[in-house]
Regions:
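Glycine-rich phosphate-binding loop of ATP-dependent small-molecule kinases
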Residues: 1-217
Length: 217
C-alpha cells in the first residue's frame, strides 16, 4: 500500500505516468479534475457543492476539495493506495491534506518529482499543430508532417493554437514552476521528495518511478 503525490511541470508526462503506475501497482490514480466530475455526476453533497462553485467560475475551496478526496480514498478501489495528480498546489493545501490524512490514520508516503529540462518541455508543449481543413493533428516530435506546416492528408496549411505558442507556453511553465518548486521544498523537508529523470522512453520513466515506490512499499 502506498499513498503518493506525483509532481512535474506541464509536459513532464504526469498523466501518462500516473496511468501507467496505477495499472502496474493496482493503485488508484486520482486526478482532481476527474474527481470533481465524478462526484458531481454521482450527486454527492460535496460534488454538488463543488459544481456550484465551478458553474460560477469560482475556485473550489480547499476544504471541499479535501473532503471529496477523503471520501474518494475511503472507497474500495483505493484500498491498495493512491497517486494524486493535480493536488495539492499550495503549501496551505499540502498542510491541510496532511492534517486530514492524519485524522484518517494515513499519510503521504512519497512524492516522485518528474524532472525534465526546460528545452525539452518547450519542445513537447509547442510541437502540436493541427489542420483546420481536415482536423488532423501533428506533433513535431512524435508525428511530424512530411512537409513543415503542411497537412499530409489534404495539403492544408497547419496552424498552431494560441495556447501552444512559445510565449504562452513559457508563461505557463514559469507559473507552474513557482508552485511546483515550493511544494517540492515542502516535501523535501519531510524527506518524502524523490526526483525522477523524466527524459527518455515513457516505459523507462515508469520503471524509474516504480523503483521509487518499491523503496517505501
Amino acid at each position: 500500500m502506498v499513498y503518493c503525490i506525483l509532481l512535474g511541470l506541464p509536459g513532464a508526462g504526469k498523466g501518462t505516468q500516473a496511468s501507467n503506475i496505477a495499472a502496474d501497482r493496482a493503485i488508484l490514480h486520482i486526478s482532481t479534475g476527474d474527481m470533481f466530475r465524478e462526484a458531481s455526476a454521482n450527486g454527492t453533497s460535496l460534488g454538488l457543492e463543488a459544481q456550484g462553485y465551478m458553474s460560477r467560475g469560482e475556485l473550489v475551496p480547499d476544504d471541499v476539495t479535501i473532503g471529496m478526496l477523503l471520501e474518494r480514498i475511503e472507497q474500495k478501489d483505493a484500498a491498495s493506495g493512491f497517486m494524486l495528480d493535480g493536488f495539492p498546489r499550495t503549501i496551505k493545501q499540502a498542510e491541510a491534506l496532511d492534517v486530514a490524512l492524519k485524522s484518517h490514520n494515513k499519510q503521504i508516503d512519497v512524492v516522485p518529482y518528474i524532472k525534465v529540462p526546460e528545452d525539452l518541455l518547450m519542445a513537447r508543449l509547442t510541437g502540436r499543430w493541427s489542420c483546420p481543413d481536415c482536423s488532423e493533428i501533428y506533433h513535431t516530435i512524435t508525428k511530424a508532417p512530411e512537409v513543415d506546416e503542411i497537412c499530409d492528408s489534404c495539403t492544408g496549411q497547419l496552424v498552431q493554437r494560441s495556447d501552444d505558442q512559445p510565449d504562452t507556453v513559457k508563461t505557463r511553465l514559469d507559473t507552474n514552476r513557482e508552485w511546483t518548486e515550493t511544494l517540492a521544498t515542502y516535501y523535501e523537508n519531510q524527506n518524502k521528495l524523490r526526483p525522477v529523470d523524466g527524459t527518455g522512453d515513457p516505459t523507462v520513466i515508469t520503471e524509474r518511478i516504480i523503483s521509487v515506490l518499491d523503496e517505501i512499499s
